[in-house]
Swiss-Prot record:
The keyword Acetylation applies. GO terms for cellular component: azurophil granule membrane; endoplasmic reticulum; endoplasmic reticulum membrane; membrane; mitochondrial outer membrane; mitochondrion; peroxisomal membrane; plasma membrane. Its EC number is 2.5.1.18. GO terms for biological process: cellular response to lipid hydroperoxide; glutathione transport. This is Microsomal glutathione S-transferase 1. The chain crosses the membrane at residues 10-33, 63-96, 100-123, 129-148. Glutathione binds at R38, R73, R74, H76, E81, Y121. Conjugation of reduced glutathione to a wide number of exogenous and endogenous hydrophobic electrophiles. Disulfide bonds: none annotated. It is found in: Endoplasmic reticulum membrane; Mitochondrion outer membrane.
Length: 155
């Protein structure tokens, strides 16, 4: 059985934990940003959310879409689609004993790409900014998966 103190002393695992915390915090901020834009623009997706602004027919005018709210919401969904695989594969990769400098480079590239992707999505910056940052992050996750499968799972 693995001694938990050894895992907590491992440089790669602690780097992964640090970068995972950063990227999860960023993803949580996207939830807050979505709520902020919904409240300030009075745009809601569910009838029960409109109660504070009116009743009956008056409340229905707040059930609409808004370009800004939708942009933030799509950026958040994109985070969910990319960060969750990174967390799973990154955890397994960090526990597989990779070279520390290579592993930390993977983690930094992913976090940097996802932060830039959010900036490119919300600003919005012209393409291919968002696409390039997406593919960098996706490529990092694929690279970790490949290295993990090749070195530890004997494929």
């Amino acid at each position: 059985m693995v001694d938990l103190t050894q895992v907590m002393d491992d440089e790669v695992f602690m780097a992964f934990a640090s970068y995972a915390t950063i990227i999860l915090s960023k993803m949580m901020l996207m939830s807050t940003a979505t709520a902020f834009y919904r409240l300030t623009r009075k745009v809601f997706a569910n009838p029960e959310d409109c109660v504070a602004f009116g009743k009956g027919e008056n409340a229905k005018k707040y059930l609409r879409t808004d370009d800004r709210v939708e942009r933030v919401r799509r950026a958040h969904l994109n985070d969910l689609e990319n960060i969750i695989p990174f967390l799973g594969i990154g955890l397994l990769y960090s526990l597989s004993g990779p070279d520390p400098s290579t592993a930390i480079l993977h983690f930094r590239l992913f976090v940097g790409a996802r932060i830039y992707h959010t900036i490119a999505y919300l600003t919005p910056l012209p393409q291919p900014n968002r696409a390039l940052s997406f593919f960098v992050g996706y490529g990092v996750t694929l690279s970790m998966a490949y290295r993990l499968l090749k070195s530890k799972l004997y494929l």
